[in-house]
Amino acid sequence: MQFSEVKQRIDRVEQCADEAERAVQAGSVPGELRQSVDAMHQQARQAQQECSSGQQGDESRLRDVVMQLEQAGDRAMQACRNAGKVDPQVQQAVQRAHDEASSLKKQLQMG
């Protein structure tokens, strides 16, 4: 996978995480969900910074960052499930961010 493609995908994850964060702020959701979405958004921003400042050759570092991003997405999804009845817009936004991160992680692992 080309570095520029990874960067684009990370940007997409960040946009989805940003959407999820806005949806969470607009609705009334449990603190755990709010915190996990915030953490996922911060992780996406960190991944973006890593791409901007990092050397293109540092694949293992990039893989680690994407792995952490996907784990943050997992935690946000779990918090969504734990919250029970959540606004569908929040649920969909969290799901999209999680799916983007998972998909990127799988593609990076395949090479």
Positions of the model-derived regions?
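Generic structural signal for well-ordered, non-transmembrane alpha-helical segments
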Residues: 4, 11-14, 18, 38-45, ...
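Residue-level signal for short amphipathic helical patches enriched in basic/charged
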Residues: 1, 54-57, 111
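Amphipathic alpha-helical binding modules
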Residues: 77-111
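A generic structured-segment signal
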Residues: 23-27, 33-36, 79-83, 93-95
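Heptad-repeat alpha-helical rod positions in long coiled-coil/spectrin-like domains
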Residues: 15, 22-25, 49, 53, ...
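Amphipathic alpha-helical interaction modules
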Residues: 24-71
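Short terminal alpha-helical segments
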Residues: 2-34
